[in-house]
From Swiss-Prot:
PANTHER family: D,D-DIPEPTIDE TRANSPORT SYSTEM PERMEASE PROTEIN DDPC-RELATED (PTHR43386:SF1), OLIGOPEPTIDE TRANSPORT SYSTEM PERMEASE PROTEIN APPC (PTHR43386). It is a multi-pass membrane protein. GO terms for biological process: cobalt ion transport; nickel cation transport; zinc ion transport. It comes from Staphylococcus aureus (strain NCTC 8325 / PS 47). It is found in: Cell membrane. CDD domains: TM_PBP2. The chain crosses the membrane at residues 13-33, 77-97, 115-135, 194-214, 249-269. This is Metal-staphylopine import system permease protein CntC.
Amino acid sequence: MIILKRLLQDKGAVIALGIIVLYVFLGLAAPLVTFYDPNHIDTANKFAGMSFQHLLGTDHLGRDILTRLIYAIRPSLLYVFVALFVSVLIGSILGFLSGYFQGFVDALIMRACDVMLAFPSYVVTLALIALFGMGAENIIMAFILTRWAWFCRVIRTSVMQYTASDHVRFAKTIGMNDMKIIHKHIMPLTLADIAIISSSSMCSMILQISGFSFLGLGVKAPTAEWGMMLNEARKVMFTHPEMMFAPGIAIVIIVMAFNFLSDALQIAIDPRISSKDKLRSVKKGVVQS
């Protein structure tokens, strides 16, 4: 509750949360928000300008851009939520087992993580696309295969830190069950860390699925997706540049929202982190990358 109170005192975090909630609502309630079919082709009305009927105009096939932008939230954001949830779930279970019990269990899980992290996520995704073909489901599968190991390592480090604390040692001394110790004394402390790495990971996953769709390797046509919309707009970017603005701005806004939320979570958990320290760490990360 203290962390939530600090988070809500940050105006940037509140705005970021509002944007994320708005995106999720629009994605889930897309049929109620817009009355157009995102895949309805009307060549007689192609490249129509902004109007009351089409607030953002139409594309090269006469499809309403705003409608496709809203429906594109589902593969671009909601599918990523599913992949992130499964990845965090697998990584958390293995991370808790590895960090708490250590020994042989820790060595076995860490070697499995080493194997998975030895392959770049883009290489794994391309391999799955080559084996099973294009589609959002294959990209989601690649997210899960590559991300769980990273989450496992981060959560393991956090669990090992809390396992060495005095209150956990006292709980072991009085004979408390291991699962009960994890559930009551360690899990609540690690939830904040999990929330931070999850929110920061969302940005790269959104950019990755949009990037693959932009290259024609992601979501299959005619399903609306931001990266695919950018690819379609690329062909007419000099004659109708406005077609690129809508999906591009949508991606930038949601990625910035998750970035702000991740930074705000870190400050809410550790108020000693100042804006100056945060700016310095961001610059250092940019230089290293």
